[in-house]
Amino acid sequence: DYDWSLRGPPKCATYGQKCRTWSPPNCCWNLRCKAFRCRPR
């Protein structure tokens, strides 16, 4: 399952780029720059 959150810094990866890692661990911004995706290891 994916945990979505609107919290986080306004940093986005450009289209086709890998997501930037951020806290909480294993989270990154999605390419749509609307939220970051938290995924278990």
UniProtKB/Swiss-Prot annotation:
Keywords carried by this UniProt record: Antibiotic, Antimicrobial, Cytolysis, Disulfide bond, Fungicide, Hemolysis, Knottin, Secreted
Q: List the disulfide bonds.
A: 12-28, 19-33, 27-38
Q: Which domain of life does the UniProt lineage start with?
A: Eukaryota
Protein's GO biological process: defense response to bacterium; defense response to fungus; killing of cells of another organism
- Stretches assigned to coiled coil: none
Does Disulfide bond count among this protein's keywords?
yes
What cellular component GO annotations does this protein have? Answer: extracellular region
* Tissue specificity note: Granular hemocytes, small secretory granules.
Whether Transmembrane counts among this entry's keywords is no
- Protein localization: Secreted
What domain comment accompanies this record? The presence of a 'disulfide through disulfide knot' structurally defines this protein as a knottin.
Q: What does this protein do?
A: Binds to chitin. Shows strong activity against E.coli (IC(50) is 1.2 ug/ml). Is also very active against S.aureus (IC(50) is 0.8 ug/ml), C.albicans (IC(50) is 0.9 ug/ml) and P.pastoris (IC(50) is 0.3 ug/ml). Binds to chitin (5.2 uM are required to obtain 50% of binding). Causes hemolysis on sheep erythrocytes, probably by forming ion-permeable pores.
Name this protein carries in UniProt: Tachystatin-C
Q: What species is this protein from?
A: Tachypleus tridentatus (Japanese horseshoe crab)
Q: What is the lineage of its organism?
A: Eukaryota, Metazoa, Ecdysozoa, Arthropoda, Chelicerata
